[in-house]
């Protein structure tokens, strides 16, 4: 009766494969344990918040949507912070929501000053993105919504020149307002480009008091890699009508050309 032995020269390779498999298994176990602990911590804090037995510091991401808000939400959760990612907090009057969660993202608040008054000691993050890719991301998002039959926008949330121009003007106004509001309180605001800056996650975590370095959560990547010609042509027309120089399309905070010469901002137009 013949016994089937592995060839001697194959044994080291088999051992290495086995060791790699064991290492991967150990890593997966560690990751799973970490996720369980994190989710348990978030759940426990949510419960304490809802029972009003805990009063965690609030963190508000006050930049626009399509600026890596999904990644920010993922980072907040990975830090063990109960995080809400959606639109219902924007009105600034949903007190149940504010009591239940610590962190809020996905869109700009209607009354930033009200949030500041209601929750003294809060931290604010202004997440930004270059104008060009931000507009394209918004247009792609609306196109997908229309294809899926779930579009419920209005005149200012559509794939039209009117909408795009209103976005650009609103972006300028909001970003400048936020920076001016916190001009005398620099420790309460962090301006960060989560898409361009590889250290963004670490900067946000450190800003919130967490030590060490942190990986950026996976981005919510737009599946449409190529920019439709209709979108690029529309943006070009809008930029021309607003007299915005082409180089300002890469600025991630505001377009200086949209300001009056007598009111040039003291703040940088880009985080770079």
Provide a role label for each language-model segment.
Residues 31-170, 176, 188-189, 198-211:
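PAPS-dependent sulfotransferase catalytic domain
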Residues 87-94, 131, 180-270:
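The conserved 3'-phosphoadenosine-5'-phosphosulfate
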Residues 2, 9-56, 227-272:
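Membrane-proximal basic amphipathic "stem/tether" segments
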Residues 9-10, 69, 74, 215:
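Residues at secondary-structure transition points
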Residues 56-59, 163, 185-187:
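A short, structure-level motif marking secondary-structure boundaries and short turns
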Residues 65, 105-108, 167-171, 193, ...:
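Aromatic-acidic/polar surface patches that form glycan- and anion
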């Amino acid at each position: 009766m013949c016994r089937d032995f592995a060839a001697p020269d194959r044994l080291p390779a088999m051992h290495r494969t086995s060791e790699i498999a064991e290492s991967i298994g150990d890593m997966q176990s560690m990751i799973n344990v970490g996720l369980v602990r994190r989710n348990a911590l978030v759940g426990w804090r949510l419960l304490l918040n809802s029972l009003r037995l805990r009063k965690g510091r609030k963190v508000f991401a006050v930049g626009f949507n399509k600026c890596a808000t999904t990644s920010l939400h993922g980072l907040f959760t990975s830090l063990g912070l109960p995080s809400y990612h959606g639109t219902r907090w924007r009105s600034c009057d949903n007190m149940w929501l504010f009591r239940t969660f610590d962190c809020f993202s996905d869109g700009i608040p209607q009354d930033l000053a009200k949030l500041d008054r209601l929750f003294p000691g809060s931290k604010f993050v202004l997440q930004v993105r270059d104008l060009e890719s931000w507009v394209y991301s918004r247009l792609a998002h609306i196109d997908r919504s229309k294809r899926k039959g779930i579009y419920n926008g209005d005149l200012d949330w559509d794939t039209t020149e009117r909408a795009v121009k209103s976005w650009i003007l609103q972006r300028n106004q909001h970003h400048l307002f936020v920076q001016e509001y916190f001009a005398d309180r620099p420790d309460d605001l962090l301006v960060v480009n989560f898409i361009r800056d590889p250290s963004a996650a670490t900067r946000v975590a450190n800003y919130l008091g967490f030590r060490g370095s942190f990986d950026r959560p996976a981005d919510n990547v737009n599946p449409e890699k190529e920019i439709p010609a209709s979108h690029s042509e529309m943006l070009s027309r809008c930029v021309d009508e607003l007299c915005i120089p082409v180089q300002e399309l890469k600025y991630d905070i505001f377009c200086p050309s949209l300001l009056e010469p007598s009111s040039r901002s003291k703040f940088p137009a880009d985080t770079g």
